UniProtKB/Swiss-Prot annotation:
This is Peptide chain release factor 1. It comes from Prochlorococcus marinus (strain MIT 9215). It comes from the Bacteria. The lineage of its organism: Bacteria, Bacillati, Cyanobacteriota, Cyanophyceae, Synechococcales. GO terms for molecular function: translation release factor activity, codon specific. Peptide chain release factor 1 directs the termination of translation in response to the peptide chain termination codons UAG and UAA.
Amino acid sequence: MEYSTLIARLKTASVSFENLEVQLADPDIANDPKKLESIARERSKLEPLVIDFNKLLDTDKEIEDSKNLLKENRNDKEMESLINEELIILEEFKNELIQKTTIALLPKDPRDERSVMLEIRAGAGGSEACIWAGDLARMYERYGQKVGWSVKSVSASESDMGGFKELVISVKGDSVYSQLKFEAGVHRVQRVPATESQGRVHTSTATVAVMPEADPVEVKIDPTDLEIGTARSGGAGGQNVNKVETAIDLLHKPTGIRVFCTQERSQLQNRERAMEILRAKLYEIQLKEANAKERSQRLSQVGTGDRSEKIRTYNFKDNRTTDHRLGSNFSLEPILAGQLDEVINACIAQEQKRMLEDFANEIN
């Protein structure tokens, strides 16, 4: 991006910030809690950018002053050397601010701030794939606990041999989707199963779908499109589950999506959870259809994130996790312990780099 274009956009952001501050001081807005909260949130988002913009302007002024001082001291070699050293430091700081503010101005995914439904399905590999699905669920649970999110299983289909054929996890918190969206895809594991007597390494897979939660307003569901059944639950509820049908079996007839929810204590709670999962699934379908063209253009760059795409391999023998999108290796044990910051931050950086390249191409 041309520097003049960057400055113009930053000035626009600064003006918007000032307008928001004026609105916050308006007594009429102060008497409207919802509007006040919305404006305060927007102001909070812009504040770091405006602070960096002011730093950039100050740095430009310091560079200009240093260059003028350099002209005045051309005959003083010692002073000239000191000024040149200062200019190098200032130019480096300016470049850092340019990079930081340019990234901050990139288009934001409006879904990034949402909580998510995380769906994990056992793939190829039989019972070992089911066990692997459970391992992934624990990995995300540990990561969620580490960053302060609320993580709860809302639907699960257990395997007779251990693990899960399928499970859905609700992850609630600030900007959950912005972090976990990079986990969508096929996760492959290479290890010796506990039941393997010959010590042979088996390869199994599990697919992860990351679905941003949808509001009822965004996804309209016709009640006539639903087929709802009940069953005795094997989930929470103590002895009550043996006597009362608390589980919900929900079928969305137009799409064939079926949701079986057992984890809550009452039929009403399970029904609400099932509807929440269904909305997230339908919202995901809407997003896929709406973004099909964009994803096809991005395929060769960062991948689609579809469930059919292998994104990561976990090799137990070599204690190595390979992220195929990044072309990078990470230590296996910390990853499985929920220490995902390094790999997620690398994915974010890769995405930002692609967006910067796209942005530069649009400008040119």
